[in-house]
Amino acid sequence: MDIPWYTDAQVMLDAHPELDVVCVCTPNGLHAAQALAAIESGCHVVIEKPMSLTRREGEEVLHAALAHGKQVFCVMQNRYSPPSLWLKEMVESGRLGQIRMVQIQCYWNRDDRYYGKIPWKGTRDLDGGTLFTQFSHFIDIMYWLFGDIHHIQGRFADFNHAHNTDFEDSGLLTFDFVNGGMGSFSFSTAVDRQNYESSLTIIAEHGTVKVGGQYMNEIVHCDISGYEMPELPPSNPANDYGDYKGSAANHGYVFENVVAALSGMERITTNALEGLKVVDIIERMYASASRPMKSVTSS
């Protein structure tokens, strides 16, 4: 097939005024500017996570979309996993009662097999940090289920990535949910050889639930008063990149939603405001403590 290719997004947009939707799947630090260019060229946009690396840039995308009457779809495909959809129903139905404590643990491997292949990964300006690149999916799930957080306290460390990244590889965060309850989020990419887990534990008024597996794809524990756990559909496997694995391979559902939403048949699963909120939460998490940032000097 004779498919045209470009090294400049604006050149592509200028050459193809017939485009309806543009997918922004470039390095994180380019997402906002390229989404803005697409919107201003008359396109709807699908933005891979994160929407941007700062709240200010995300707000610019949101305002441009409103001004031009365009839709923004943020790729947060873990929402489509059966355990995530089940948790959403359990929380929104009130079956769990008051949420008292939430603990999220994300322990993955990202070593030279990952950072050594693609130069922008691990850089401050184009990657942004582990919360943006590896774990924003799970911050999105947390926000989607329980709402916003405040009173954030954090600690960050770089255990074994000083040679290949500009920032932390691990962190511990505690906070309160605005809607009530306490939370904690611990993460690391310093796990040896392979991913260990991504888990979410809920201590609630009417019971306890834990979702685990490598990317919150398994129900590990369910003990809820007067409730019998149903059999959920199987989760899709993780995105497999050879030497390492990512989150759930649910991108097909994202694009089904894009088509359905633009056809007026569905609501957007993860809209611009939700994508912006994830960036805002990460920005506040990082602001809660000193990060082990490598000094970057301009040449």
Task: Describe the residue ranges of each PLM region.
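Beta-loop-alpha module in the N-terminal Rossmann-like domain of NAD(P)-dependent dehydrogenases
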Residues: 3-64
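Hydrophobic residues in well-ordered beta-strands that form the structural core
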Residues: 7, 47, 72-74, 185, ...
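C-terminal helix-rich "cap/oligomerization" subdomain common to oxidoreductases
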Residues: 11, 19-24, 257-299
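Rossmann-fold dehydrogenase core element
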Residues: 59-77, 98-103
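Predominantly a Rossmann-like dinucleotide-binding segment in NAD(P)-dependent oxidoreductases
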Residues: 78-164, 292
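Contiguous beta-strand/loop segments that form the cofactor/metal-binding neighborhood of enzyme cores
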Residues: 133, 139-217, 252-265, 298
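Active-site loop of classical SDR/Rossmann-like NAD(P)-dependent oxidoreductases
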Residues: 242-255
